[in-house]
Regions:
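Charge-rich, low-complexity N-terminal segments
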Residues: 1-115
């Protein structure tokens, strides 16, 4: 028996895609949404597995709100690269199944390992 928990955190940031030809090679911004899927195999005596509030607090400390992502990171901040980056960061503290980074309500990238 297991549960998959979902926690989301929004942040606003600017970026541009390096080595890309098209409109996204220019600086632009998004209200990103970081969606983290966590695995839990048991519940505590209160009926929960992982406290959503603690996860949200942790995610707020990770996201570079109102920053230029190209300056914040040493890689081209595509949705794909951001999803992989956040997967590894969150995995240091929580049992991550997958991470999705949404650039808009209908465009995003997911990253998972071992699948």
């Amino acid at each position: 028996m297991s549960w998959e928990l979902l926690v989301k955190q929004k942040f606003s940031a600017a970026h541009f895609l390096e080595n890309y030809k098209g409109k996204c090679e220019k600086m632009h911004g998004h209200t990103f949404e970081l969606e983290v899927h966590l695995r839990a195999s048991e519940l505590d005596n209160s009926g929960i597995s992982i406290d959503f509030g603690l996860v949200k607090e942790y995610l707020r400390g990770l996201v570079p709100d109102h920053k230029v992502l190209n300056e914040a990171y040493g890689f081209s901040p595509s949705a794909e690269n951001l999803a992989r980056h956040f997967f590894h960061q969150v995995s240091e503290k929580y049992p991550v199944v997958k991470v999705v980074v949404w650039e808009s309500e209908d465009a995003g990238a997911a990253y998972a390992e071992g699948q």
